[in-house]
């Protein structure tokens, strides 16, 4: 039987260090309102802001948002085009806000497939925030977990081919060192919105020991309270004692003062 804990015993030490989020349900959210899918993608940007703000207030080390998977290229061309333009617009508009809040932005994925215009924006945004020491915000764009593992193994294969590495020396730690986000803690909490219960080729290696939290909320409806509820669930799972979203909100407020 679990017991409710007092706020004084709830510290930042029990919170997840790295949260991954599959932002799902933009299209269905828009459809429910009689709007085109792109309307949902634009509304989802506000949910991103709220989630980043909440994670930063809680002192989370890193948060990784699944913005565009390598499979998303199969969507209708018009929708993909709108998503790319939205990505450019959001990067241009939000990067100064991120920088002001000491947030370091990283774009992970096969970015070479993006337009030169978008690649330039990515480099500019990452460069501006590269020295920031607060929350690390990873945006997974044209990313897939299989791709990440493949590129890591390929890099090691090149080293073996050149005679700089023996095949027998390859172990889990060496592979992990070649993955994206290798300098960050492994994911301990994965959140997926919209009621879907799958990980969709997202961070397959890094989420090996993560707790999975699924919510029926569509992504545009996700907010600070939503993240607080997910983190409270994580604390209850990890520490085997009761925790509420209100307690997590109280921690946010303490950080905000």
Curated annotation (Swiss-Prot):
Cofactor note (record): Binds 2 magnesium ions per subunit.
Cofactor: Mg(2+)
Biological-process GO terms, alphabetical: cell wall organization; peptidoglycan biosynthetic process; polyprenol biosynthetic process; regulation of cell shape
Keyword match Magnesium: yes
Keywords, sorted A to Z: Cell shape, Cell wall biogenesis/degradation, Magnesium, Metal-binding, Peptidoglycan synthesis, Transferase
Binding of Mg(2+), residues: 24, 211
Family the entry assigns: Belongs to the UPP synthase family.
Name this polypeptide is given: Ditrans,polycis-undecaprenyl-diphosphate synthase ((2E,6E)-farnesyl-diphosphate specific)
Organism, as annotated: Aliivibrio fischeri (strain ATCC 700601 / ES114)
